[in-house]
């Protein structure tokens, strides 16, 4: 009897302990499920409120049958997972064990680890290069990390270069067509001129669109070539990083001074071009204003030069003619005067030639006395010749006349 009562009391205590354990286990399971659901919703971008606790325990067999590590398939009656769990918690069944609770917690931990691993993989795709681990203390590990870092920097630089080139091409393309539109707006006759020159007015729009598409195709082709060149450089850098880095650095070091020199030359040429163009326009403008007066002045000056030259030549010819005529006339007059002159003394009987002596005649001037002596009265030893310069025809005529007059005098 006492043994029976003892068994009954033990059974009651075991039932009370079992019910308390079931309630506690159900609470743990519900909290774990709600935490798991909240984590999944947060990863998906939504957050669901926590469900309220239920007092009824979950049947152990049905919960064990439904809860697994794998995802639960949809049921035939169309009920979702949460409603099934709620129904299972409201039913009365056997107690849930601690092993099942641990399985649920392990499932939650496994799911969280999988989600974290997916996030790490996504980050590694965006940033493929990882910093070296603290354990990689050898020189080769640091060198490998340095090479990877250089590759990443060069890859980013290549992408930025291609992006800047594309932006520059787009800007130039936009500026070109804006300038064309403004020119057509400011100078409407340009469109008519182009249409009359290259075709009908209806086809000018088609021609502009064709040129625009052609320019776009050239721009795309050039951008593709640039991208292909950058890719080739990147692949060469992966294969031979030192040689490629040396070539790129040498090319950059050569391109920079060449670009500066080219820029200076272009700037200087452009400056002088505008200076010469301005001077040409100014000189052309003023010459067009004063072309008629300048031509008139030059014509008058040419007429004056020709007139003065003609008058000078004529005056020289007239003076020469007058001088020659006067010289001839004076010569004739002197000849006549010499013929009409009579001797002032009578002739005496002549002495022999051997006894004759040259006697000076004071009536004859001294120059003529020295030169005008008849050769039959004097000898060669007694004749004294002095240089007499005949500067003109008048002097020569005077000398001739004096010679003729001297021959008629009898020198004693």
Curated annotation (Swiss-Prot):
InterPro entries: Osw5. Keywords: Endoplasmic reticulum, Lipid droplet, Membrane, Transmembrane, Transmembrane helix. It is found in: Endoplasmic reticulum membrane; Lipid droplet. Residues 192-247, 293 are lumenal. The chain crosses the membrane at residues 171-191, 248-268, 272-292, 294-314. Induction: Levels gradually but drastically drop as cells approach stationary phase (at protein level). Residues 357-373 have a biased composition (Polar residues). Residues 347-374 are annotated as: Disordered. One of its GO terms (biological process) is lipid droplet organization. GO terms for molecular function: protein-containing complex binding. It is a multi-pass membrane protein. Residues 1-170, 269-271, 315-412 are cytoplasmic. It comes from the Eukaryota. One of its GO terms (cellular component) is endoplasmic reticulum membrane. Involved in lipid droplet (LD) organization. Modulates triglyceride (TAG) storage by reducing DGA1 LD localization. Promotes LD targeting of some proteins, including PDR16. Interacts specifically with the seipin complex FLD1-LDB16. Only a fraction appears to associate with the seipin core components, suggesting that it may be an ancillary subunit of the complex. This is Lipid droplet organization protein LDO45. It comes from Saccharomyces cerevisiae (strain ATCC 204508 / S288c).
